[in-house]
UniProtKB/Swiss-Prot annotation:
UniProt-recorded name of the protein: Protein SprT-like
Protein's GO biological process: response to stress
Lineage of the species this protein comes from: Bacteria, Bacillati, Bacillota, Bacilli, Bacillales
Entry superkingdom: Bacteria
UniProt KW Metal-binding keyword: yes
Family membership noted in the UniProt record: Belongs to the SprT family.
HAMAP family, A to Z: SprT_like
Subcellular localization: Cytoplasm
Cofactor binding description: Binds 1 zinc ion.
Cofactor entry: Zn(2+)
Entry GO CC: cytoplasm
Residues forming the catalytic site: E68
Amino acid sequence: MNQAELQRHMEEVSLQFFQKEFRHQAVFNARLRTTGGRYLLKSHNIEMNPKYLENFGLAYFIGIMKHELCHYHLHLEKKGYQHRDQDFRELLKKVDAPRFCATIPREITMHEYTCKSCGKSFLRQRRFNVNRYRCGSCGGKLIQTGSKKIYTENA
């Protein structure tokens, strides 16, 4: 999906679920990390996280669009648009939009180091120079034995 398709989808979702036009811009923002989308109060534009489309599919992504459009339409109508406001919660229920996003699985590379003397194994996220450090248990020399990718649910 590109920017033009996102704009078209946002306009269609707005008309279908809110019976109101979306007259501003919807753009992808890949720098968003822990949120599915963001409504900008000053410009009235909506930024969407493309990682949620890749990881969870179009149906889930449309739910995030509906959530952001709730903020958008309530703010323009000068009603309570924040998560804690009653107007916002009622509109979320009416259009069946999610209140929160699921976390995106994150890929972490773990580096494995092993002591030559005692054979103890260490896992670290950051690589380090094995010539500068020794085993904490026996003082032996370390060697890097490999690295592996781990997927976590924490973002």
